[in-house]
Curated annotation (Swiss-Prot):
Annotated site (Arginine finger): 313
Ranges of biased composition (kind: Low complexity): 482-500, 514-530
SUPFAM superfamilies from the UniProt entry: BAR/IMD domain-like, GTPase activation domain, GAP
Positions of the UniProt region annotated as Disordered: 472-576
Official protein name in the record: Rho GTPase-activating protein gacP
One Pfam family from the record: RhoGAP
Coiled-coil features, chain-numbered ranges: 123-189
Biased composition (Acidic residues): 565-576
Length: 576
């Protein structure tokens, strides 16, 4: 009967607490805070594990589609191999891409398994064990606390009543004391358990989240390793395509020689080509120390330095880029300052630098030397070493580099552009510092570090900006009657009326750069000949002494350049 009555009292007390008719005064604030933290952790971990499982399910559908794509590549490769034996290259690249795609989907499958086995399942186990045990312990604590509180209320009521026998009050007091002892013991145990559970859950969660990152690290690392192994094959395939294209162009030239207008057009193009042209040949033809296209492009970009964001990072309209590239290469009239989107001009400059012949701007032979400077810990010694390496560049290469880095340093100094030295190095570096052999992924970051250092230390390396010596109109107008050679060689004698009505701008054309360290003795063959006594011979071989020439790089239909695939929303401010 006593037990039944005690249960009635406890149930009544429990109902009163839940209906807010009686405040919970026995439970300490620490216990309430520990319970709240445990409950929140459990809820968030449940949401997290469900999201991981949902992501792996959707990724599984993508894996099925990717596997089907890989099978199609391989089937096409087998068909070409069996039925078109002359298309060995096509069959080979189809096979390699199919194998890569299949391996990539297998990597994605392993990633999903890792996310489930190493992340989701262990977190679910924490919910079902530690957190569940803590919840049950707190439930037992609440049961003991409510029983103790109910008997305290009952004892208080007995003491208020009259004609209650002392033995009954004494019995109630003894019961309350027993419940108090039990309540304190259970309270200590529950508090310790909740503390331990929260700590263990934190450690376990951090560990599993590290496993989450490790899974993705393994995924991307293996993917990059596969791509790095395929890069030499990609170069071989591209060289094959370029060779076949060249053979096709030769056959077209032989046919076009039979038709006078087409022959004249081909001859005209060879006299006006800018992109992919040997720099010494181009400068000799134009009679200048800096390509006229670069002069106009740099001036147009300078007009936007203080107002435009993302110069050299954001992409222009690819159709417009291609149209202006054609105009410049074909010697047609153009005006870069009239282009509304300055990013088109920036993309044209990157495209020109990427296709520079016969070598990239920082040359193949100096690539390893520049990369090795990253191992120099002392900043001053590193800058001095880079300066010494750059001073050994051919004179016409050094002049172009001087003007380019001057422009980049001006952009980096403008907060509005949001293009610090590191940002600029990321998008410009791969176009001027290129390895002649296999690409080493680790060297890309080191190369960007070198270019960042050059931009940051422009004044120290180059001794200041180039001198202002000549001016050039905004608009390029082709000379009349196809007498380009004579007109270009006598460019300084052309009257202003020969150009479209636009303001002439002052440009940087330093024929003898102000860095005294340039080695003229090693570059005598690269000096620009402006004499009318020695006209430019388009059939003469490129005048260059140094490392072997690199293969021509043709523009793609998309006219994209390295670094142009960024969307504006993807832009991040890199640390300088």
């Amino acid at each position: 009967m006593k037990n039944f009555k005690a249960k009635i009292i406890t149930a009544k007390q429990n109902v009163m607490e839940k209906t807010a008719k009686r405040e919970n005064t026995l439970e300490p604030d620490e216990m309430k805070e520990l319970e709240k933290k445990t409950t929140e952790t459990k809820d968030f971990l449940r949401k997290l594990t469900k999201s991981v499982e949902k992501e792996t399910l959707s990724s599984g559908v993508s894996i099925q589609d990717g596997t089907e794509l890989a099978d199609n590549f391989l089937d096409y490769s087998v068909h070409v191999r069996d039925n078109q034996s002359d298309l060995v290259i096509l069959s080979g690249i189809l096979s390699k891409i199919g194998e890569f795609q299949a391996g990539f989907e297998d990597l994605k499958s392993k990633l999903n398994s890792s996310l489930i086995n190493d992340v989701s399942d262990p977190l679910k186990s924490i919910i079902k064990t530690e957190l569940k045990q803590a919840k049950e312990s707190k439930r037992e604590y609440d049961r003991v606390r409510v029983a103790f509180d109910a008997h305290l209320s009952e004892l208080a009521n007995l003491r208020k009543q009259k004609n209650v026998k002392p033995p009954k009050i004494q019995e109630s007091e003894e019961e309350c004391e027993r419940l108090r002892t039990n309540f304190e013991r259970v309270g200590i145990d529950t508090t310790c358990l909740l503390r331990d559970t929260n700590v263990i859950t934190e450690f376990e969660t951090v560990e599993k989240l590290c496993d989450y990152l490790d899974s993705y690290h393994t995924f991307f690392q293996k993917g990059y390793r596969w791509l790095a192994q395929m890069i030499p094959d990609i170069y071989e395939y591209r060289l094959y395509v370029e060779k076949r294209k060249a053979e096709l162009e030769k056959s077209k030239v032989r046919i076009s020689m039979m038709v006078s207008p087409q022959k004249q057009q081909a001859d005209s193009l060879s006299k006006t080509k800018c992109f992919g042209e040997d720099l010494s040949v181009l400068l000799n033809r134009e009679g200048s120390t800096l390509p006229w296209f670069i002069v106009r492009a740099f001036q147009a970009i300078r007009n936007h330095i203080a107002t435009e964001e993302g110069l050299f990072r954001l992409s222009g309209t690819k159709r417009i880029i291609y149209e202006y590239k054609q105009k410049i290469d074909e010697g047609k009239e153009y005006n870069l300052s009239e282009i509304l989107d300055i990013h088109v001009v920036c993309n044209l400059v990157k495209l020109y630098l990427r296709e520079l012949q016969p070598e990239p701007l920082l040359t193949y032979s100096r690539y390893n030397e520049l990369i090795d400077t990253c191992n120099i810990e002392d900043q001053n010694q590193r800058v001095d070493k880079i300066s010494k390496i750059l001073s050994s560049l051919p004179k016409h290469y050094y002049t172009l580099l001087h003007h380019l880095i001057h422009l980049l340093s001006q952009i980096a100094s403008q907060p509005k552009s949001k293009m610090g030295p590191a940002n600029l190095a990321t998008v410009i570096g791969p176009n001027i510092l290129i390895c002649q052999t296999d690409v080493v992924l680790e060297d890309i970051a080191l190369g960007n570090m070198v270019v960042t250092t050059i931009i940051q230390n422009f004044d120290r390396i180059f001794g200041g900006p180039p001198l202002l010596q000549q001016s050039v109109p905004d608009t390029y107008v082709p000379p009349p009657n196809n007498t380009r050679n004579n007109s270009v060689n006598n460019f300084n004698n052309v009257q202003p009326s020969s150009f479209s009505a636009s303001t002439s701008r002052s440009i940087n054309l330093n024929k003898s750069t102000n860095n005294p360290n340039i080695n003229d003795d090693n570059n005598n063959n690269n000096n620009i000949n402006n004499s009318d006594d020695e006209p430019y011979d388009p059939n003469a071989p490129p005048i260059y002494s140094g490392v072997p020439m690199r293969g021509n790089i043709k523009h793609s239909d998309s006219c994209s350049t390295l670094g142009d695939s960024f969307d504006e929303g993807d832009a991040v401010e890199l640390s300088d």
